[in-house]
Amino acid sequence: MTKANKVLFITQEITPYVSESEMANIGRNLPQAIQEKGREIRTFMPKWGNINERRNQLHEVIRLSGMNLIIDDTDHPLIIKVASIQSARMQVYFIDNDDYFQNRMQTADENGVEYEDNDSRAVFYARGVLETVKKLRWCPDVIHCHGWMTALAPLYIKKAYKDEPSFRDAKVVFSVYEDDFKNTLSDDFAAKLMLKGISKKDLGDLKEPVDYAALCKLAVDYSDGVIQNSEKVDESIIEYARQSCLLYTSP
């Protein structure tokens, strides 16, 4: 592989838009470090409902918004917003939708109750990022996915979007964290994630109902590298990545 000059970051959390955490700090600092090495970056995260748009100066990018993504036979408008972290000279794109992200937290609500449609939210987020990158006509060399909400991106990149100029030559890296959800995903999850170019065979041993470990293993199947970013990660995921000779443990 030639030198990675363009890096796409797809993550769940970035400070200062959400509270500091292991993932949010990496989501903030790693893209800046890569950019300071002279690389070109694009960074995406969901527009969670607890992000203050006025304080963080988010604004909609009209030319990128307006597409409808069909999930479970329902149209869901894709809204793209953008903001800048001035101290890092870094721009962040936000994937937004009234049904999935407005007035809603991350995995669970303020009472700790996990959202029943987390599977659909993950499908929308992954597809929303990839469709936006296509519109930008930008071709990353490396795509670095952080956290379970991004776990479908490797499958989509390597199957549904494999012939797209923006993605056909990209290498995919998946970072796992201690960010597991407790409930299983909906019983029709496999049907929801299907797109042209993806067959049931491509889902391997994915059996419903799908839990956190199974979702992350699906990401491992279609990644070129896996990074363990938290000390405490489901051991079955780590062993699965190790058997695939893909695992790198972050120092």
Feature annotation, model-predicted:
Residues 29-39:
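A short, Lys/Arg-enriched amphipathic alpha-helix followed by its capping loop at the start of a domain
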Residues 3-20, 46-47:
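Nucleotide-activated donor-dependent transferases that construct or modify glycoconjugates
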Residues 118-195:
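Conserved nucleotide-sugar donor-interacting segment of glycosyltransferase catalytic cores
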Residues 167, 180, 197-226:
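Membrane-proximal helix-turn-helix segments that form the acceptor-binding/catalytic region
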Residues 248-251:
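Conserved small/polar residues in nucleotide/adenosyl-binding loops
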Residues 87-142, 197-213:
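Conserved nucleotide-sugar donor-binding subdomain of glycosyltransferases
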Residues 13-26, 52-54:
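A short, glycine/small-residue-rich beta-strand->loop->alpha-helix junction that serves as a flexible
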Residues 43-82, 203-208:
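Active-site donor-binding segments of glycosyltransferases and PAPS-dependent sulfotransferases
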